[in-house]
C-alpha cells in the first residue's frame, strides 16, 4: 500500500470513528424525508380498499428509507458544491466527518434494502416506482440536470412528486388517474417553491456554479415563471374534489389555499424594488410549505374520517 493510500485509509478510519448516529441521520435529509413520508402516507390512505396495517407500515418505512437513500447519494455526489454553499458546508462530507466512499456505500445499501423489501413484502409495482424515484433523484437530477440547466427544478421535481403514487401503488397495485393527480400537484408546486428560495439564496448558488433560474435567466424571468406555475398548480390542486376522491371540505380548502398561493406569487412578480422582491420571495417560500402541508393534511383527514365511518357502517 502506498503512502497516499495509507493516509486515505487512516483519514477514512478517523472519519468513521468521529461519525455519530446523528451524522448518518443528517445524510438522510430528515426534513425532506418527512415531507416524502407524509405525502406517501396520504397516497396510501387515500387509495381505495383496505390494506393490511403491517404491510402499510412496511410500505411507509420503505418509502422513508428510499428517500433517505436518495438524500445520501445526493450528498455523496454534491460534496464539492456543498463545501462552497453556506447552508450546506456543515454537512458530514464537507465537514470531514464521514468519508465519501462510506456515504456512497450507505446510500446504495439503503436503496437496495428499501426496494427489495417493498417488492418482496408488498408488491413489485410500488418497488419499481421507488427504484425509479431513487434513480431519478440521484442520477437524472443530481448528476445531470442540477448542474446543466436552469430547468433542473422543473424536470427534477418529478422525483419529489412520486411518493403519493408509490403509496397508492402499495395499497392497490395500480397506477390510476387519481394517483397521477397527486403527482401533478407536487410536480407543479416544486418550481415556484424552489425558485422563491433561490431568489434569496442567489449568491450561494452562484458561488457553487449551479445554474438556477435567477442566475441564468434573471430575477424577473424567475418571478414570471413562478407565477405561471402557481396559476397552473392552483386548479390542479382542486382536482381531487372535482374527480370525486376528496370531499367538499377539501374542495373549499384547496381553492382558498390555491388562490392565496397565486396571490403570493403575483406579489413576487409585481414587486418593484429589491427589498420588496426579497420579502415577497420569502413569503411565497414559507406559504408554499403551508400550502402543500395543508392540502395533503386535509386529504388525509378526510380519507381517515370516511374509512372510520365506513368501518362503523355509517356509509
Curated annotation (Swiss-Prot):
What's the top EC group for this one?
Answer: transferase
Protein EC: 2.5.1.141
Q: Which GO terms describe its molecular function?
A: protoheme IX farnesyltransferase activity
Q: Name one GO biological process term.
A: heme O biosynthetic process
Pfam families the UniProt entry points to: UbiA
The entry's cellular-component GO terms read: plasma membrane
Catalytic reaction annotation: heme b + (2E,6E)-farnesyl diphosphate + H2O = Fe(II)-heme o + diphosphate
Q: Which UniProt keywords apply?
A: Cell inner membrane, Cell membrane, Heme biosynthesis, Membrane, Transferase, Transmembrane, Transmembrane helix
Listed PROSITE patterns: UBIA (PS00943)
Q: Where is this gene product found?
A: Cell inner membrane
Pathway(s) where this gene product acts: Porphyrin-containing compound metabolism; heme O biosynthesis; heme O from protoheme: step 1/1
Q: Where are the transmembrane segments?
A: 32-52, 53-73, 93-113, 120-140, 153-173, 180-200, 226-246, 249-269, 295-315
Q: What is its main location?
A: membrane
Summarizing the function annotation, the protein's role is: Converts heme B (protoheme IX) to heme O by substitution of the vinyl group on carbon 2 of heme B porphyrin ring with a hydroxyethyl farnesyl side group.
Protein family: Belongs to the UbiA prenyltransferase family. Protoheme IX farnesyltransferase subfamily.
Q: Can you say what this protein is called?
A: Protoheme IX farnesyltransferase
Species of origin reads Brucella canis (strain ATCC 23365 / NCTC 10854 / RM-666)
Amino acid at each position: 500500500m502506498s503512502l497516499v493510500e495509507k493516509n486515505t485509509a487512516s483519514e477514512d478510519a478517523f472519519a468513521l470513528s468521529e461519525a455519530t448516529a446523528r451524522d448518518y441521520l443528517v445524510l438522510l435529509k430528515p426534513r425532506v424525508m418527512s415531507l416524502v413520508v407524509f405525502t406517501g402516507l396520504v397516497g396510501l390512505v387515500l387509495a381505495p380498499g383496505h390494506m393490511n396495517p403491517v404491510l402499510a407500515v412496511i410500505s411507509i418505512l420503505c418509502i422513508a428509507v428510499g428517500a433517505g437513500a436518495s438524500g445520501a447519494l445526493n450528498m455523496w455526489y454534491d460534496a464539492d458544491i456543498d463545501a462552497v454553499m453556506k447552508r450546506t458546508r456543515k454537512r458530514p462530507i464537507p465537514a470531514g466527518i464521514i468519508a465519501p466512499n462510506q456515504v456512497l456505500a450507505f446510500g446504495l445499501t439503503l436503496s437496495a434494502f428499501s426496494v427489495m423489501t417493498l417488492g418482496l413484502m408488498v408488491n413489485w409495482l410500488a418497488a419499481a416506482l421507488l427504484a425509479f424515484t431513487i434513480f431519478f433523484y440521484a442520477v437524472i437530477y443530481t448528476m445531470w440536470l442540477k448542474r446543466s440547466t436552469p430547468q433542473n427544478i422543473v424536470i427534477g421535481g418529478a422525483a419529489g412528486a412520486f411518493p403519493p403514487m408509490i403509496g397508492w401503488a402499495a395499497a392497490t397495485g395500480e397506477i390510476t388517474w387519481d394517483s397521477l393527480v397527486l403527482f401533478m400537484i407536487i410536480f407543479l408546486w416544486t418550481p415556484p417553491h424552489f425558485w422563491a428560495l433561490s431568489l434569496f439564496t442567489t449568491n450561494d448558488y452562484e458561488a457553487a456554479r449551479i445554474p438556477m433560474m435567477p442566475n441564468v435567466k434573471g430575477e424577473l424571468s424567475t418571478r414570471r415563471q413562478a407565477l405561471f406555475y402557481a396559476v397552473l398548480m392552483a386548479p390542479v390542486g382542486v382536482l381531487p374534489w372535482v374527480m370525486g376522491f376528496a370531499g367538499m371540505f377539501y374542495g373549499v380548502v384547496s381553492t382558498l389555499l390555491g388562490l392565496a398561493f397565486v396571490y403570493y406569487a403575483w406579489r413576487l412578480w409585481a414587486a418593484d424594488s429589491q427589498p420588496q422582491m426579497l420579502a415577497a420571495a420569502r413569503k411565497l417560500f414559507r406559504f408554499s410549505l403551508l400550502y402543500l402541508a395543508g392540502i395533503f393534511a386535509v386529504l388525509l383527514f378526510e380519507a381517515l374520517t370516511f374509512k372510520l365511518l365506513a368501518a362503523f357502517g355509517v356509509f
